[in-house]
Amino acid sequence: MQAKSEIGITTMKQEVNPQDTSRAKAFGLWIKSPMPMVTFTKTFDVTRLYKVCKRRGVKFNTLLCWCMGRAATRQRVFYLLPEGEKLYKYDRLAINVIVNHKKGDICSCDVPYSDDFYQFAADYDRMTQTAIDTCESSFDEEAMIIGTSAMTATQLDSIVNQYSGVFNNPFLAWGRYRKSWFKVWLPISMQFHHAQMDGGHAAQYLEDLQQIINHL
């Protein structure tokens, strides 16, 4: 479960001129929109992911989050993010994971994406356990964050309207997976800022995610 990133990237977070990027037109159209977020929902065949987790003793959500990060490395738009009325370029990605801490509330941590799954899994376990124990969130300001939320208390068909007006990051959310005969299914909702990417980018991302799961 190792793969080499296909993206040529810079060395640090930096502000860029939107007009010098492929997002110039979209940035002008959407950066001041009162509701610039779009949500897609796709039902994934996660049978392969489920079997790999069972066979190797890997946590389902850990491997799923790694696959999400892996799919994002295939598109340059994931290394751009609008903040306020500016556009920033990043050199790396991280996955935000929400956990229930010991005081009964929630907090989160930004787990750095690595092409090496086992490195990612080690960071995931360490950072989520620290968040649970300390009841404090940790943030990586130098990475483009892919938000996630696993609400596994029930099965969910779709999750929408997560826009806060503060966080413009791509956000993926899901409920409990569903078993049907010899298949395991999981609807996943993806919210994205239209200044960062178009619907075609998001659709391709979801397709890439399915293919990565299929080839674990």
What are these regions (language model features)?
Residues A3-M35, T47-V52, G69, L81-E85, ...:
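Domain-scale detector for complete catalytic domains at protein termini or as standalone homologs
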